[in-house]
Amino acid sequence: MFAFVAASCGSDSSSDSGSDDTTAQTDDTTDSDTDTDSTEAPAVTAPDEVETSVVAETEAAVYGGSVTIGLESEATGLRPWEDSCSSPCYNIMRSIYDPLMEQVGTGGYAPFLAESLESNEDFTVWTLKLRPDVTFHNGTELTAQTIVDMFPLQQAGAAASSAIAASFLTDVVAVDDLTVEYTLSESNVAFPASLASGPMGYPFDPAAAAADSAGYSISPIGTGPFVIKSRDIDNETVVERNENYWYVTADGDQLPYLDSVSFRPIPDEGTRLDALLSGTTNAAQSLRQGTIRDAREAGDSIELIEFQGNSTGGGMYNTAQPPFDDQRVRIGLSKMNDQTRVIEALGGAGISLPTTQWFSADNVWWTQEAADAYITFDFEGGVESLQAYINDPERSDGKAVGEKIDVELSCPPDPTLIAAMQVLEQVWSGSELVNVTLTQFDQATHINNAVSDIHHAHCWRWGGEGDPAASINPFVADSAVSIANFVNYDDPEMVAWAAEANATDDFDERKQLYANIMTRINEQALLWYSGGTAVMIAHEPGIQGINGWTLPDGELGVGIAPEAQVRWYQVFVSDS
């Protein structure tokens, strides 16, 4: 049996400053720095533009107090098996649910609600041991049978079904009261990452969920540090301290420290920052470069925790919708993506660098091969590619030869996002070959449009701080099964590469396989990129524990990675 420890399949190292990235230097091109016997990836240096190290909290924690945080949007729902979740949603979910596994500062995964996780030799059977004496908020005990009973709901869930398919999970069995055996149809060395994610890794009460699924989204029941108190959608969600929370620190402190946390969706970036500066809220989340710039200039009344790693802005083409089913159109539009101007419109000058793949240039998974395949700005080349499609009598959109193509370009209604989309619109329209319609929907609708495949050209964020399999494998999986294949592009070779990467713990081999996928995505022009996404939690002085949280075994976590997500169980308000 192989015991799963924090070193496995990690992306980076132990002190964050942008995703999982950290402060010890590593040359990505040097084989000697990679430990191929374990699957731990070496540490890397984060960009100078964003500098926040993750260090353990040293100040003595204090019980009591409340925090109100402004989020960039409302949660699509609070059912981990059903609702597609982004960063604001996970900020709420992480207060209510516990993950079975959690990411650590070394980039790998360690047990959280689990006590241990082991695999067989070919990574097709995983055995998980739960912590004893854990109860849900309604008093129901968490057992191995709970995990088994969750599985049918997850198989039918919109969010979990695609995650299950991508993980190759086929069966879940209770070995005893606290031992669960997961059986996979194929090898999957990255399976622990699935148990750290919401769709598969957040235990919920299956009986209550089956009895009233819609109600569960309003009154979710988890094992987490806080219990839902009230949920006023689009206004405020309030959670209060779980007096029976299982997590007791090495110093004997029963978590959490706070009495309550309030989550307020404030979609407008300026309004959200102003709410913090005026004292209406105590903290604010942002994934917008312009807001980080403004917060930096706001003075000493607030403190910033920043992070930049494997999260890149950009967008995608839905290949199920003509004319995006034709590579010539995708290449033509991508050659008209002026990354420098888009980054400036986003307010990211001096903060973000242009990206070419899902990994930042200082990350161990980044490759020159994928970077060289990325389509860079070439207006004349873009015109030539679009013209070839427009003049084709067999063009897929059914229009007459010579007619312009129609493009609906959609993004949420944030001013910087609108400005960035206007840069694209001006260049695309300026070719005199494209009719562009700009649309804006709130983030929840924007996500749902992608999930339901009614999108065309759609702005999006790409990447992730954990094992690449967690984000890439669902993206390349069968589009009929995986909702994460937002581009609806099915490539058997990419599926095979992802499967091969799942079947080995050799880092160099896995890195090449994911480089193949990133290169193919660029060659097919399925996505366009802008720059790396810096993220931020800004807060009033005195709020502690956001960035330096630890796991039950004392190991340091990953700070606010990914994408400005807070683990609320160790946050406290200092009295000093």
Where are these regions (language model features)?
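Structural transition elements
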Residues: 226, 353-392, 413-419
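Extracytoplasmic/peripheral linker and loop segments enriched in polar/acidic and small residues
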Residues: 56, 60, 346, 375, ...
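Ligand-site clamp/hinge motif
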Residues: 214, 245-294, 433, 442
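Gly/Pro-rich hinge or "lid" segments in bacterial periplasmic/extracellular proteins
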Residues: 104-105, 196-256, 260-262, 380, ...
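Surface-exposed binding/hinge segments that line
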Residues: 129, 163-208, 225-232, 335
